[in-house]
């Protein structure tokens, strides 16, 4: 289905959108009015086309939700509405009547059901997927409504059990993802793995494993998967005053996070958080640190990640429509860290017979997602180094007319070999067109 528009644009999503909130800090800082043109304009200009959660419940704040929908419509941004008035025991007609209160807005794209539910073997014990089977199945029966649930990711170092949660191994995680796909009948799949909270590009094996799992179940159930990208860190759902750490990730790491997700088959990119919740800024002695996270700071200013996010989204806009129509078949990797972190990658696939960084001493290497649609092949090549640019040489089985596509490049070349130059963390899509000779 088309999640954004009839053109089939790739969803570029933000979690935590503008909302109605009144808060005053101990030092007298007050939350601004987020439900204004300026915030939606900033979101649009960054390339975001969908907000999948705003923290507002239509059942409790109908006027504020309607205002958000109206503003989003003005700036051609979609919104998923959270509405606790939608219940699993309602009939199809009752659900349709309830949603008719806001579904007439062009910005209405679906319903936010729940974030990070668990199962008996994975996640929180007090918020189980099974609690949402009925409402998910009933909302899923509407052709024009997406019911949005975001899952946990697999973190092997989290394994353990306490009073509230249970974290087990990959087999249990896969059972959790399968339970969701099988019993909730979703139109899309997503999970949030924030690599830079604990790891680096060099130690990204678990990150790529998560992408592999999501892609597997997305293909099995013939739905797209979306991957979350972290804009900052130091989340603070506990609402406690916290000392500030050094800020992370770096801009090129965000670029890499997006491009590797696309190479691994993601058909949607979701950023967290879009608008920094005010409590994510709580610092000692009543101070507020607005620099920690968010595309937009809680004080209303653009964050240090705004420019790199906009750049990443320009890349998605350039290649997204092609990738949305193609299926990932195999990963190719070359270079020490690329090969270590993608252990099931090969060194060639299909018409791509060789991919080599020109600087063989670069340990980070390069990777490529190998895509097909019918008989057409495409290769999404990514520089796995977030500090240094790389030149990459690719050799194919024959000479082809090739389309080279990125936010900074659109070329048609005819060759058996090509070289592409990639900035740190950057990617390029190579689409094979007509074979020139055998």
Task: Outline where the language-model segments fall.
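Glycan-processing catalytic domains of CAZymes
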Residues: 1-398, 406-408, 412-435
């Amino acid at each position: 289905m088309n999640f954004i528009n009839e053109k089939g644009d790739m969803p570029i999503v933000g979690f935590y959108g503008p909302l109605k909130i009144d808060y005053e800090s101990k030092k007298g800082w007050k939350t601004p009015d987020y439900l204004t043109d300026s915030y939606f304009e900033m979101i649009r200009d960054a390339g975001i086309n969908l907000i999948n959660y705003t923290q507002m419940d239509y059942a409790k704040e109908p006027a504020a939700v309607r205002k958000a929908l109206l503003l989003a419509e003005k700036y051609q941004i979609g919104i998923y509405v959270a509405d606790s008035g939608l219940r699993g025991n309602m009939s199809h007609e009752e659900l349709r009547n309830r949603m008719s209160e806001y579904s007439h807005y062009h910005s209405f794209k679906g319903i936010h059901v729940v974030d990070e539910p668990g199962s008996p073997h994975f996640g929180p014990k007090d918020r189980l997927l099974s609690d949402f089977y009925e409402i998910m199945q009933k909302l899923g029966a509407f052709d024009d409504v997406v019911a949005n649930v975001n899952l946990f990711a697999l973190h092997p170092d989290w394994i353990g059990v306490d009073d509230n949660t249970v974290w087990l191994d990959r087999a249990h995680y896969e059972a959790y993802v399968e339970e969701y796909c099988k019993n909730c009948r979703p139109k899309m799949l997503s999970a949030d793995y924030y690599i830079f909270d604990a790891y680096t590009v060099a130690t990204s094996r678990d990150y790529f494993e998560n992408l592999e799992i999501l892609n597997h179940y997305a293909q099995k159930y013939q739905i797209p998967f979306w991957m979350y990208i972290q804009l900052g860190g130091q989340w603070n759902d506990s609402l406690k005053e916290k000392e500030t750490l050094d800020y992370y990730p770096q801009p090129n790491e965000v670029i890499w996070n997006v491009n590797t997700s696309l190479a691994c088959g993601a058909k949607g990119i979701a950023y967290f958080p879009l608008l920094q919740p005010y409590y994510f800024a709580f610092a000692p002695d009543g101070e507020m640190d607005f620099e920690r996270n968010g595309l937009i700071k809680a004080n209303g200013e653009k964050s240090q990640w705004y420019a790199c996010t906009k750049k990443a989204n320009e890349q998605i806009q350039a290649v997204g429509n092609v990738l949305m129509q193609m299926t990932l078949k195999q990963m190719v990797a070359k270079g020490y860290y690329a090969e270590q972190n993608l252990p099931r990658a090969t060194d060639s696939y299909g018409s791509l017979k060789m991919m080599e960084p020109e600087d063989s001493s670069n340990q980070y290497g390069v990777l490529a997602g190998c895509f097909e649609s019918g008989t057409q092949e495409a290769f999404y090549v990514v520089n796995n180094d977030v500090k240094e640019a790389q030149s990459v040489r690719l050799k194919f089985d024959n000479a082809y007319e090739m389309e080279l596509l990125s936010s900074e490049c659109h070329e048609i070349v005819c060759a058996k070999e090509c070289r592409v130059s990639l900035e740190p963390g950057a990617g390029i899509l190579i689409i094979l067109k007509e074979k020139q000779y055998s």
